[in-house]
Amino acid sequence: MTKTARYFTVLLTVVLVITVSIWGPEALAKYKDKGILNKPHIEVVMEAGEGYRYQMNANEKLYILARCIGSQVLSESEQNALTFYAGNAGLDYEDLEGSYAFVRKYNGPSGKEITDEQIYTTCNEGLRVLKELNILPQNVNDVNAASYNATLYSAIDVLEPRNNVVVWKMELSNSQKNADKENRLIDAYIDADDGKIYEFYARTSLFWGDIDTDAIIEAWADYMGLGTPSAYESDNPLLETTPYFKKYVFPGMGEGRTIVTVGYYEGINEIFLKIS
């Protein structure tokens, strides 16, 4: 091959490389676009807010729920008593503020959560278990859709949204205010996954002297899978809405802890177990 021929061969190769480098990517992109454009495609995406749900243990779930509802939502009996004691003690109560939210779940149950149709049966099953454990007396009546309202809530750690607990709140309907409340559940918080009862207020025929708080908290802790609690002395007994109570403390999340109170309202014969 002559020197001139080799020169033209090299020049042709260079031109070819430059042409491919410029035209090649554009041609490849057009080829790929043909398989995408003007054709319907289906892509499965997660709904907003429907992310990975972190599996918390029983103590962590109790702690998150307690932080969310501790001072935001009070039972009818506690609201009345709190108003009375606050007025007499000259105390000013404000709603709990911070990085925890307790919000109604308007989109309803998801996944394996207990449904609207199942919650009344689930609550009655929970009451049956509490009676068997002697946490509640046998004469507490079952709930039903005609007399009770069931509302689904999410208790959320705003800074760590994966830390959330979904619960049903079961409460005696406002239309039942003038009804006989003896031996009836007033309200309760029920886990939307396993149906366990976190907190309850119930009218009974018991008196404070009939109630063994240590036995109740031991049985309830075992039922919830919480481990053994420690006794807790209230920093300020005046903040309580009844003189009849005993407090216990459970490990929470991180350095946090959950206070569980077993108490009693004299006059209306109402026993309660609340978390805070």
Which residues does each predicted region cover?
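Long, terminal "pre-/pro-" and other extracytoplasmic accessory regions
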Residues: 1-276
